[in-house]
């Protein structure tokens, strides 16, 4: 189907690089699209105004092409409409803090255990590339655990962090940046602060 859309000029080849759709619980007839992926000649930086502006413009153009594509090529989408577009592009990886412990891919694949684990997960190492056909999805061998020390600053006593900015290597962060893990990190930070106040 994508080849037909490209051939007919409805979408560009880059638009087909990543296409992911989810149903939305409790909202019959509604789908959430987790696309497009912004491809570039260089790695984009979330700290660069020019790169973010490029990603916003390119992303919106791709969204409208994909919208016209699904309406034309997917039965049942003839009356579809876009109800919302994110204000900013999703950034998977940016700056990370240095914590009391830097969590690594080796910790993950060895299922290393810790005295104060904040989450127990099994999401794979999911690396999205700015180049076409170079992304990887590397399954962890076993479940893995993250220590609270990866959420506590090595330099400042009262500084915690939760989410994609945790203290981890690039590969480990690629598995831990998902929403459910981030929720667990936020909860763990609150619990650790309360535990220390007792």
Annotate each language-model stretch with its function.
Residues 183-197:
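Internal hydrophobic alpha-helix adjacent to the cofactor/substrate pocket in enzyme cavities
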Residues 1-161, 166-172:
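Mobile, glycine/GP-rich and aromatic-enriched active-site lid/loop segments adjacent to catalytic centers
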Residues 175-177:
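Short glycine-enriched, charge-decorated loop/helix-capping segments at active-site entrances
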């Amino acid at each position: 189907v994508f080849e037909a859309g490209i051939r007919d000029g409805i979408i560009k080849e880059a638009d087909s690089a990543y296409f992911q759709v989810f149903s939305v619980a409790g909202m019959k007839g509604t789908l959430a699209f987790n696309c497009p992926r912004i491809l570039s000649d260089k790695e984009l930086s979330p700290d660069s105004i020019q790169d973010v502006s490029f990603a916003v413009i390119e992303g919106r153009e791709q969204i409208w092409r994909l919208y016209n594509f699904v309406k034309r090529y997917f039965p049942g989408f003839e009356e579809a409409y876009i109800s919302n577009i994110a204000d900013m592009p999703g950034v998977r990886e940016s700056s990370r803090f240095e914590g009391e412990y830097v969590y690594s891919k080796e910790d993950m694949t060895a299922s290393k255990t810790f005295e104060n684990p904040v989450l127990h997960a099994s999401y794979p190492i999911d690396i999205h590339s700015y180049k076409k056909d170079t992304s990887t999805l590397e399954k962890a061998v076993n479940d893995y655990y993250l220590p609270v020390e990866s959420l506590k600053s090595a330099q400042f006593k009262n500084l915690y962090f939760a989410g994609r900015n945790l203290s981890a290597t690039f590969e480990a962060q690629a598995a831990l940046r998902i929403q459910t893990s981030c929720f667990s990190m936020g909860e763990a930070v609150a619990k650790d602060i309360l535990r220390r106040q007792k």
